[in-house]
Amino acid sequence: MVSQMFGYIVVNQSEMKFKEYDVYRSYYCGLCQSLKERYGVLGQLSLNYDMTFILMLLTGLYEPEDPFEKHQIRRNLFTDYVADMTVLFACYKAEDDWEDEHSLKGLAYSYLLGKKCRKKPLLYADKVRSISLAMQDFVDAEKQGDADIDTMAQIVSCREDEWKDNLERLGFFLGKFIYLMDAYEDVEQDIKKGTYNPLKKRYEEPGFEEECRQILTMMMSECCKEFEQLPILQNVDILRNILYSGVWCRYEIVREKREKDSVNEVTGNDL
C-alpha cells in the first residue's frame, strides 16, 4: 500500500480566482510536457496534482527564472526534477500494486517505465538511493503486519540549504496525510480484499471517523506550520488554498458518501 501521489493535494477551485486557477494549470501543463519529453506517453500517465503542488512549492521558495514560460505552460529548473520524482514514485506504486493485488497492469507499467528510467542519466543518485531505502523499509514493515501509522515519511527537499529541514518536515507530514487519506478512503475495500491497511483494526471501533479527522488535522497542522516558516511570496495564495482547503475536498467526499451509505444501510434494514 504505497500510497503516494493520489490526487489528494489539490486546489479548492470554488475558492480560487480564475487567474489563480489559470496559473495553477500552467504549472500542471508544464509538468505534463516535461514528463512527455523525458519519459514519453507512459510518463504522462503518472501526472498528478500532488506533484504539481511540490513544483509550485519549490518554485515559490527559490523563485527560479521561467525560461520556458508561456501563457498556458510554465516550466523552470525544478520542473524536470519534479518530473523525475513523479516517475520514481509511479514505479514504486506500480510495483506495490503487483505485490498487493497481483495487478498485471501494475507489473507491466512498472517494467516499461522502469526501462525508461534506467536509460536516463542518474541525476539524483543520492536521492533515489535514500528514497529506495525508505520505501523498502516501509514495504518490509507492511509485510510484517505493522499497522503503525507513523511509519510513512517522504522527501520533498531538493537542496542542502537553510530550508532543507523545514522542507523535509513539511514533506514528512504531507506524506503521512496522503498515506492516511488513502487508508481512510480504502479501508472498507481493503478489509474485503484482506489487503494491508493501517486503519483496519480501528475501523469497527466507536469514534473511528472522529479519530481519523483528528489525526489528519494534526498532520496538516504540522505541515502548514512548516510551510508558514518558508519565505514564500510567489503564488502563496494558491499554495495556501491547497494546504488549508483543497486537501480536505476528497476527505469530505469520502466522509459524506460513507455517511450516506451508512444511513441507507440502516434504512434498508428497517424495511
Segments (PLM) and residue ranges:
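Acidic catalytic motifs of isoprenoid enzymes
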Residues: 1-169, 176, 180-209, 213-217, ...
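Short, electropositive alpha-helical surface patch
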Residues: 238-244
